[in-house]
Amino acid sequence: MLLFNAEFLREEFDLVDRKLNKIVNAISTIKEVLFEKNTVVTSVYRDDPDSTHYYYRAVDLRSRDLTEKECKKLEKIINQLFPYGKKPYQTMLYHNSGSGWHFHIQVRAEHDEEV
């Protein structure tokens, strides 16, 4: 089940890129089937033009309900199923960017050239 850390995130999620929406919902289903866990959206929009969040092409998902091994397994599965299409970037990144470990999910702009 796809859940939101705060109600305003649900409203922001309604604005995300169509492909991103589908990928996040697929992640939610896969996570529920493999690990019997819900998926929680923790961040959508950010007011920083250098961030994919600014363009509604990225969201962050909670990872603390999974072990590190499970997180890496999910990351590998999602990146195989939904390749970003522009190296060295990935669709799903399990990382700590200073605010704690989480999943960053992103899609590239449709006009981006594949590399």
Mark where each language-model region is:
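Catalytic cores and adjacent binding grooves of peptidoglycan-active enzymes
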Residues: D14, D50, Y55-R57, S63-V115
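Active-site acidic/histidine clusters and adjacent loop/turn architecture
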Residues: M1-F35
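Short secondary-structure junctions
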Residues: K31-T39, P83-P88
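Active-site nucleotide-donor binding segment shared across nucleotidyl transfer reactions
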Residues: E36-T52
